Amino acid sequence: HVTTYAVIVLAILYLNDKGLMGYVNDNHLHDLGKFMFAFSIFWSYVWFEQFLLIYYANLPEETIYFLERWEGHNKIYKTSEILMVILNFLLPFLVLMTRDAKRTRIFLKIAAFLIIAGHYIDFYQMIMPGVVGKHGGYGLVEFGMVTVFASAFIYVISGELTKASLVAKNHPFLPEALHHDI
């Protein structure tokens, strides 16, 4: 999933900035950027294909999914739906298009944060219109839950990273991975 690659990129860049992963070079980052770019495009394909499948198969009982998000509940979800497509497809596509952008740390960080935010909105859009309807919206509870779970995730992962070596020293392909070149 593209969010996983976004989190991996952020973790690697953070550890590299702290000097714990000095062996990660621009070629490694380029490959991770390619994965983020590819899975972002794949997400867009699957999302649009869902719409096309409902439209071309003439499944009126399924159109409620899109109708509820575009026209229903006083159109409170329409802005989020548009923002979701921009954050998950358009901006990562534009940011990660060039080879140099996939090798530049700030562009990778920007794209990773955009993708994570976009996928939060994606999951929100899947659940909230059908569950709470017109009473939905972004408030303290939504941002609080993201903060709590992100903090717990960072706490657990940072605790686990202190317990093990970040390099598998006896792995047979380690020399090849350290000298990764594109």
Language model features with spans:
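Extramembrane terminal tails and long inter-domain/linker segments of multi-pass membrane proteins
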Residues: 20-26, 149-182
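Central hydrophobic cores of alpha-helical transmembrane segments
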Residues: 107-117
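Extended C-terminal subregions enriched in glycine
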Residues: 78-105
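Extracellular/periplasmic helix-loop-helix junctions in multi-pass membrane proteins
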Residues: 101-105, 126-141
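Membrane-interface transmembrane-helix boundary segments in multi-pass integral membrane proteins
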Residues: 61-85, 132-157
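Hydrophobic cores of alpha-helical transmembrane segments in multi-pass inner/ER membrane proteins
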Residues: 1-13, 86-92, 144-160
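Long, contiguous internal "core" modules enriched in hydrophobic/ aromatic residues
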Residues: 1-81
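Hydrophobic, well-ordered secondary-structure elements that form the walls
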Residues: 45, 92, 123, 165
